[in-house]
């Protein structure tokens, strides 16, 4: 009887050891699974965080780019407004030149046109007030232009045109012309004027 009990005790002891081993292995496996799950969760969290940071940086850069674009747009609008104001003031200044200064300007513009056309006889056209000034001083006008050119030229006053000032000079038959009205001169020089005005105003 005592031998049977010993056998039963041994069996129970071995069973208990197996149970403890199984439980221990199960615990280890559970910890391993938990650790792997934690690591995956952590990796996932890090990935989400990196993605969020990347998206946030992209949004930040987009916002900065948009703000810079808006600032540039506003700056260009202000620049354009100021350039237009300067050009408008220039037109007004040219349209209100004192008579003597304006007369000399007309002589210069006519001389330049005749040089470009390479003709000795021309028709000069402008607004009514300008033509009236030229007619009043026609002998002096012809003499001044001739002296600048270094040769005698024949100048005829033509029909009035719509302009704030300056002259349109054309050949007697109207086949060739040079538009030296103030509007045309400003238009031809506008790109250069804009660059100079922008540099003066904005550096």
Curated annotation (Swiss-Prot):
One CC-aspect GO term: plasma membrane
Listed Pfam families: vATP-synt_E
Coiled coil: none
Main location: membrane
Its membrane topology: Peripheral membrane protein
Entry's Gene Ontology molecular function annotations: ATP binding; proton-transporting ATP synthase activity, rotational mechanism; proton-transporting ATPase activity, rotational mechanism
Family listed: Belongs to the V-ATPase E subunit family.
Lineage per the UniProt record: Archaea, Methanobacteriati, Methanobacteriota, Thermococci, Thermococcales
Key words, A-Z: ATP synthesis, Cell membrane, Hydrogen ion transport, Ion transport, Membrane, Transport
Protein name, entry field: A-type ATP synthase subunit E
Subunit structure: Has multiple subunits with at least A(3), B(3), C, D, E, F, H, I and proteolipid K(x).
Localization, UniProt: Cell membrane
Gene Ontology annotations of biological process type: proton motive force-driven plasma membrane ATP synthesis
Known role: Component of the A-type ATP synthase that produces ATP from ADP in the presence of a proton gradient across the membrane.
Gene3D superfamilies documented for this protein: ATP synthase, E subunit, C-terminal, F1F0 ATP synthase subunit B, membrane domain
